[in-house]
Structures are given as C-alpha cells and as structure tokens.
Amino acid sequence: MAERGELDLTGAKQNTGVWLVKVPKYLSQQWAKAPGRGEVGKLRIAKNQGRTEVSFTLNEDLANIHDIGGKPASVSAPREHPFVLQSVGGQTLTVFTESSSDKLSLEGIVVQRAECRPAASENYMKLKRLQIEESSKPVRLSQQADKVVTTNYKPVANHQYNIEYERKKKEDGKRARADKQHVLDMLFSAFEKHQYYNLKDLVDITKQPVGYLKEILKEIGIQNVKGIHKNTWELKPEYRHYQTEEKSD
C-alpha cells in the first residue's frame, strides 16, 4: 500500500455518502453489456406513508439474455427490481477506486445498504428454471474413444476429493455442506413442485445439515407458525410464482 503513493481523500473531506447494493448475478452481467457509458436503467426513490421505497427498472434493450452458463438461451430478464433497505449496522464501510496508474481514491462512506431483488414474475421464474436445469446437468460427459489411451495414471485406493469430502462429513456430522448457490437452486426447484414443505423433507431433498439449511431458508422462505400449514416452510412473496392462498387460523 505504501508503494502506491498518495491516497486521495477528497470523498472523505466532502463527506460523500454512497449506497452499497447487492444485485443478482444476471443483472450485473446485463449491465456489463451496455455500450460505453450508456444508461442501464432507472432508479426510482419515493415516499409511501413515511417509508422510503426504492426500485430499479432495467432498460428494455438490456433485458434479453442470450446465454446461461455459457450455453445459448433466449429468455427475458426481469425488469422491475424493488430494493430491500438495510441499515449499515454500526459498521464503517468505505468505497475506494484505483486508477490505471495505481492511484487510490476514497470515493465515499457507505450510508445505506440494500439488496436489489427481482419482482416475482413469469420472466424471473423462467430464468430460475433455466438456471436450475443448467446447474443440474452433469459436468462430466462420457465419450467413446476411437483409439487406445495410453497414460501413466494408476488406480488409487481413494481419490483426494473423496478423502476431503469424507473429512468434511465427519466435521459436520453426517452431511457435508454444499455450495450455497447449489442449495438455493435445489430449494427453488423443490418449491416449483409444491408450495409447502416441512423441514425434514427439505433436509432429505438437499442432503444438507439442518442448521445450515435453516440459515438459507430464512433468506428466501417463511416458516408458518399457525393454521393448517403449521411448521411448514414456503417461499417469501418476492420469490413466488403463484398466487398466495388464504390461510386458515
């Protein structure tokens, strides 16, 4: 850091406030396709009964997605994205930029955190289905060789990957944690089939430790505490592709 020279603190001196916003991966990929410094969408900030409501609308010419996971596709990205506002939580967060000459500049201090989420729509559910289908395809494919393969590979009692997997299973009980995005994909796929699940069934479907699974479920789901669906989980409204049923008390 010392070798990079001076640090420009103009942003701190001007007390510039910035927002730290988490956006879906597909949205950042579509932004990257915008020509030059072109417009990517519109941000709307409004007051509703004293509460601040923020939403982002993606430009129509950036809504077409032509590939998913490197494979050709034809689907429209959701255009409407309401924000879920969050507090900074007593943290001091700053934003820096680095120029081509390695000069660091402090652009501002984070005054608001938020998550940009797609509004529930047919486009979003179709996109999720394609992503889930793509992620469920086998990474390795078998291919018949037309000649003898000569290598120096020798059989081993156990591969390093399996050894590491077994070690993780022992550390985390009987189940090893999978990548969070993979677990989310499995959950979305399950909720495509049924609206309600009890935790035991979701554990059987995902093969994940109960504590880890509940952490992820709390981000996308709601646990019903009364009515005919008591003790079951369902998706939060923003992730649903169906109309909400009226629940009995």
Curated annotation (Swiss-Prot):
State the Gene Ontology terms under molecular function.
DNA binding; RNA polymerase II general transcription initiation factor activity
Where is it chiefly localized? nucleus
Q: Name one GO biological process term.
A: RNA polymerase II preinitiation complex assembly
N6-acetyllysine is carried by which residues?
Answer: K22, K33, K137
Q: Which Pfam families match?
A: TFIIF_beta, TFIIF_beta_N
Read off the Gene3D superfamilies from this record: Winged helix-like DNA-binding domain superfamily/Winged helix DNA-binding domain
Give the modified residues of type Phosphoserine: S142, S248
Residues that the record marks as modified (N-acetylalanine) are: A2
Keywords (A to Z) from UniProt: Acetylation, DNA-binding, Nucleus, Phosphoprotein, Transcription, Transcription regulation
Instruction: Indicate where this protein resides in the cell.
Output: Nucleus
Recorded GO cellular component terms are: nucleus; transcription factor TFIIF complex; transcription factor TFIIH holo complex
Q: Which domain of life is it from?
A: Eukaryota
Q: Where does DNA bind?
A: G227, H229
The record's similarity note reads:
Belongs to the TFIIF beta subunit family.
Q: What does this protein do?
A: TFIIF is a general transcription initiation factor that binds to RNA polymerase II and helps to recruit it to the initiation complex in collaboration with TFIIB. It promotes transcription elongation.
Tell me, how does this one assemble?
Heterodimer of an alpha and a beta subunit. Interacts with HTATSF1 and GPBP1. Interacts with URI1. Interacts with GTF2B (via N-terminus); this interaction is inhibited in presence of GTF2F1.
Protein name stated in the entry = General transcription factor IIF subunit 2
Lineage, top ranks = Eukaryota, Metazoa, Chordata, Craniata, Vertebrata
